Structures are given as C-alpha cells and as structure tokens.
Amino acid sequence: MAKAFVFSLCLLLVFNGCLAARQSQLSPQNQCQLNQLQAREPDNRIQAEAGQIETWNFNQEDFQCAGVAASRITIQRNGLHLPSYSNAPQLIYIVQGRGVLGAVFSGCPETFEESQQSSQQGRQQEQEQERQQQQQGEQGRQQGQQEQQQERQGRQQGRQQQEEGRQQEQQQGQQGRPQQQQQFRQFDRHQKTRRIREGDVVAIPAGVAYWSYNDGDQELVAVNLFHVSSDHNQLDQNPRKFYLAGNPENEFNQQGQSQPRQQGEQGRPGQHQQPFGRPRQQEQQGSGNNVFSGFNTQLLAQALNVNEETARNLQGQNDNRNQIIRVRGNLDFVQPPRGRQEREHEERQQEQLQQERQQQGGQLMANGLEETFCSLRLKENIGNPERADIFSPRAGRISTLNSHNLPILRFLRLSAERGFFYRNGIYSPHWNVNAHSVVYVIRGNARVQVVNENGDAILDQEVQQGQLFIVPQNHGVIQQAGNQGFEYFAFKTEENAFINTLAGRTSFLRALPDEVLANAYQISREQARQLKYNRQETIALSSSQQRRAVV
C-alpha cells in the first residue's frame, strides 16, 4: 500500500511538472495584457550579396501575444535565396516582383525532368560559345601579327594539325565510350517549381525546405509570417531558420538576448545592420553556419559518396556569402514554358474553381483524394481586383484567403486577407472572433485605432507603407484610409478567420431589437432605428466626405 502511494505521489509530481512546463511555454500567448501597441518597421537587417533580410523583434509583447514572428526579404535581380526550412509554418506574401519558388517534400518524386534533346542542345550551345571565343581570340592574334605572315602561317598550320588531332581523339573517345556515357550521363531532374508574382500567397509547412530566385526585371519583395505558437512547432517560441547552403547569419539575431535598443530609434530599420558575409573568427574551425557545417567532413563525404572537397563546399567553408547570393549568368533549371495563352488559361481555371466553390456555398467537397501530399497546391493569387469578395465603388475592396480557397491552410491553420481602400474609405469597426491579425502596410497610409476590453485605445496611430502592426483577438479595430489610399495584407492565425462588425448592414447593431438599443444606449426608438439602418454598406464603408462629394 505504501509503495502504491509513493508511486502515485511521484506520478502526480511528474504530471504537475509537465503541466507547468507546458504552461510556461505557452505563457507568452496566454498573457496578452497589452497596454500599448505600435506600428513598427523592421528592427534588424542583414545585408546579403544580392539582397537583404529584415526582421521584426519577436520579443515585443504584441508578437509574443500573437505567437508570431515576421520578416521581409528583398531579392535583387538574378539573386538566389538559398534553401532553408523553419521550425514553424510560414505564410509568404509577394509584395513586388516575380520569380520562381521551389519547395522540397521529402520522399516525393522529381516530376520535372530534362529531356535528352534539351540536354544535347545545352551542350551544343556551350560548345558553340567556346568555338566563338576561340575564333575571336584567333582573329585578334591574326590582326596583331600581320607583319609576320610566314611565321603566322606556320603557327596556323600547326594549330590546324593540333585541332585535327584533337577532333580525331574526341571522335575515337566518343566511339569508344558510348555505353559509358549512356550509363553515367544523368539528365537534370528535380521536384516541381512554381512561378510567383505580386499578389501571390505561398504556404510553407514547418520543416519543408524551399528556395526562391528572382528572374524578373525588378526587386522581388516578400513578407513572411512565422506561426511559432503553432502545434507543428515542438520547440520553443523562438523562430529558427535552418539553412542548407551558404554561410548564413541569424536572421532574428537572438533578439531576446540582443542589446536593448535606444529610445527614439524603435521602428528604424538597420539597427543591427552588418555587411554581407561573416568574419572567420566567429566560426569554429573555419566552418560555415548551415546544417551541413556541423557534421564531420569525412563522415559527411562518406554519407554522400563524394570526396572531402565537395563535402567542405557543402559546409560553406571558405565561403563568405550568406543567405542571398548572386547567380553568375542565368539560373538554368527545368521548367515548363509559359506563354500568354497558358497564363490566361491558368487564370481562367482559377476563376472557374472559385465560382464552383461559391456555388457550393463555400463548402469544400473533399473526399481525401483531391490533393496528394506530393502535389499540394501551395499558392494562390489574391491581388487581382476581379477576385475581390467585398467591393464598394466608393470605399474599396477586400479579398480573403482561407482553407476553402487553399486547402493546405487547413493543415497550417492560417488564413489571409488583402484590402485596398480608396481615399478616406473606412474598414468597418470590428473585432476578430477567432484569430489574431498581423497587418502589413503595402502602400499608402491610414489611421488605425485598436481598443482593449477596458475601452482603452491601445493603438491610435497613422500607419505608413512598410510598417507592420498586430490586432489581438477580440480587440476592437477601425481603419480609415488617408489621402494616399490604403493597401494592406493581413495574416490570420486561424484557418477560417472571421470578424464581427460594429457598423453596416451585417453589423452587431443591426441584429439587435430597437428596444434593446434604446435602453442600452439611452436613446429614443427613432434614434435606434437610425442607428441600425443609416448605413447600408457591409464592411467597406464610404466616408461622409465621399458621400457629400457624390451628392
């Protein structure tokens, strides 16, 4: 009996200890006693060879409350953002530019394969370029040796003989090694790549490696949200990026341990700005900082069946480049050609799919076979004005993205919203019922107010382009576009986030009886009816100034 009691007591202590540890891990998102919010620009910047990465301090109270972290990535033309994965699900919005993104799902086949014809054409082009270079060099030498004609002719004859000898050797080698080439010649094969452009939303699950490349004619800019409080993150609440190439720097700079920023400098980018690369003395034994760097070089070479020099290249030894590198020439990989007709066909398919979902009342008729793991659809474009879910010709438009539009969001438990408001347009006062909202200002400006449960305005600020602010769950918020209009993108921490409005045709006030309004607000019944029916719009509201201008 005594042994059973001791065992029960020990089990109870272990259970309480685990529960306390779990509560301490989740304490940041449970302690949302926010007295002040602020729209901020990034706090930290890493300068790379072909771009930059900026991050917001995730240790701020509002980020801790929402359980998120955020970064902004700028990739210059012909820049390659090296492969990496994160401990948390990511939602990426393409603010500007176009490019290519590749996501690697372990165990899935390489469905993009180079044909033998294209491979031969590539080799022929390389050989043709070499011959042209040789001809140009030969012409230069001939022009410089015009006075020594006899000696030049002798050298030409010698070169012709050497060229014939080389050609004979090549022909003999090609005739003697056809089977060897067939055995060891490997054409390029890789997993699917995806074209990305402005307005795209890309979902990346935790632990899935991805890379991106800017092949456009302007900078490629993307904003990333890391949902660090997700159940998919079994580590702590700190965002972590695991790079598989290069010599990367810590993007979030271990901001919980970083030096405090001086007052008056909050929100100013470049506080921790550093030149691209990393001093060798900060590294152990001259190794890099990617995942391969920590392995023993000999053991890594044996595992990959390569020589140690190749293994050291994977480890980033003697490589000063960090997260974003510049590609020499053009990045050549297998991708299907895209003409105007193909793009239009893809857009029509997306519109048809959207109409089918609307006809089904927003219901996703899933049978478990509509998408396989290896063919998951990772992106959706919500930048097209024709895709708007809410539109007012005098106020603006709003587009939403959730698990009905992009099924992978059900797995990640994230959703998104993009809005464009005209000058003085108002986003109806509302509260987020089941999610936090992380808002990034794409263009323009707006006045934003956020109110807590005590009726205090914990945010009352004019937000500007490039800033980010957080609206906690259930907190009231109102936004009015400024003179430049207001364009934003909002990350939502729930797969099907929705709001309750305080003004408009579908608002909380419209749903109450007249007598309840009259008694609650000490107004007459006539005033109660005016309060309910004076606003016929739903969410995108025109201002009184706009209505007077129209009249």
Curated annotation (Swiss-Prot):
Expressed in seed (at protein level). Residues 118-132, 145-159, 161-175, 225-239, 281-295, 510-524 are annotated as: IgE-binding. Keywords: Allergen, Disulfide bond, Seed storage protein, Signal, Storage protein. Residues 1-20 form the signal peptide. Residues 37-312, 380-529 form the Cupin type-1 domain. Disulfide bonds join C32-C65, C108-C374. Residues 339-350 have a biased composition (Basic and acidic residues). Residues 282-293, 311-323 have a biased composition (Polar residues). Proteolytically processed from a single precursor to produce an acidic and a basic chain that are linked by a disulfide bond. The keyword Hydrolase does not apply. Residues 111-194, 238-293, 311-361 are annotated as: Disordered. GO terms for cellular component: extraorganismal space. A motif (NGXEET) lies at residues 367-372. PROSITE patterns: 11S_SEED_STORAGE. The keyword Disulfide bond applies. Residues 114-124, 132-148, 168-185, 254-275, 351-361 have a biased composition (Low complexity). Gene3D superfamilies: Jelly Rolls (2.60.120.10). CDD domains: cupin_11S_legumin_C, cupin_11S_legumin_N. One of its GO terms (molecular function) is nutrient reservoir activity. Hexamer of two trimers; each subunit is composed of an acidic and a basic chain derived from a single precursor and linked by a disulfide bond. Belongs to the 11S seed storage protein (globulins) family. This is Prunin 1 Pru du 6.0101. It comes from Prunus dulcis (Almond).
